[in-house]
Amino acid sequence: MNGTEGINFYVPLSNKTGLVRSPFEYPQYYLADPWKFKVLSFYMFFLIAAGMPLNGLTLFVTFQHKKLRQPLNYILVNLAAANLVTVCCGFTVTFYASWYAYFVFGPIGCAIEGFFATIGGQVALWSLVVLAIERYIVICKPMGNFRFSATHAIMGIAFTWFMALACAGPPLFGWSRFIPEGMQCSCGPDYYTLNPDFHNESYVIYMFIVHFTVPMVVIFFSYGRLVCKVREAAAQQQESATTQKAEKEVTRMVILMVLGFLLAWTPYAATAIWIFTNRGAAFSVTFMTIPAFFSKSSSIYNPIIYVLLNKQFRNCMVTTICCGKNPFGDEDVSSSVSQSKTEVSSVSSSQVAPA
């Protein structure tokens, strides 16, 4: 084996030289130069400094402006809430571990960090599934003129958290475990060992099928059908030009959110699959460190995409930041809502094709 397995950890370095030390007790400077750990800590500080205000402001603006409290926006608020929890409860632990180059908080801290990182990623993924299904049902109309109500949105939110807990919870109760990965400063499920006490293999298979492959299939199927429907409607002029543009704008926003998720998480998933299918193979510590830390950037993608592409939300945010005034001359947000082609919530509650 080209790595060293210990109690609650696996270091991708053979201990023939006697250098390997527990990542819960000693700095891991034998794995990488000290400056590399500092780079990771500064990167985590950036994500915390950006993620807290972006997601916090998203929640605050939504609760402050009644016009934003529409069914489809519930799912987007759910994303922001999950990101904020992950930043506060997970990223802060990762930052501290990176600064000291080992998990100061021990196996419990590792489990906490791994749990919240998994929760954040899974809530984001299943929220995108809910949005994809909503887009498919409302635009493709397999159920007729469907109205996406508050009840549907709340059920969707409950579903995202149930599925996220179904993925992040088992390692806390003995089905697999969370262990340090890469440079031993962030934690994730155990893809590395075949420890029979934790049944890692069955958990990893379950996770990749139920919590990655299935949602990806649903998302791609929904948007594949959606794109065909939008093109068909445009060709036949079934809807007004305003409605068609609204459909395209809202759909573009959600598709960009999906692409942002894939950009952040696909490298990590691909690396984890390779490690899982090539247990014992040699790989450098940076091989898992880079995708593991890069995946955490997803916590700041969605608020940025939402602000850039949702005119109503953007106006409300500017008004909130500027204490009730919009210096860009678009102060009458309520009137702009009725005219905006990119506004998500009003489109989502209509009985026409856009959500």
UniProtKB/Swiss-Prot annotation:
Tissues with expression: In this lizard the color pigments are found in the rod-shaped photoreceptor cells which have been derived from ancestral cone-like photoreceptors.
Organism: Gekko gecko
Molecular function via GO: G protein-coupled receptor activity; photoreceptor activity
A Pfam family the protein falls into: 7tm_1
Topological domains, Cytoplasmic: 62-73, 134-152, 231-252, 310-355
N6-(retinylidene)lysine: modified positions: K296
Chain ranges on the Extracellular side, renumbered to this chain: 1-36, 99-113, 177-202, 277-284
Biased composition (Low complexity): 334-355
GO cellular component: membrane
Functional summary from the UniProt entry: Visual pigments are the light-absorbing molecules that mediate vision. They consist of an apoprotein, opsin, covalently linked to cis-retinal.
Record's protein name: Blue-sensitive opsin P467
Residues with glycosylation annotation: N2, N15, N200
SUPFAM superfamilies: Family A G protein-coupled receptor-like
Transmembrane segments: 37-61, 74-98, 114-133, 153-176, 203-230, 253-276, 285-309
Post-translational modification remark: Phosphorylated on some or all of the serine and threonine residues present in the C-terminal region.
GO biological process: phototransduction; visual perception
Family: Belongs to the G-protein coupled receptor 1 family. Opsin subfamily.
Superkingdom per UniProt: Eukaryota
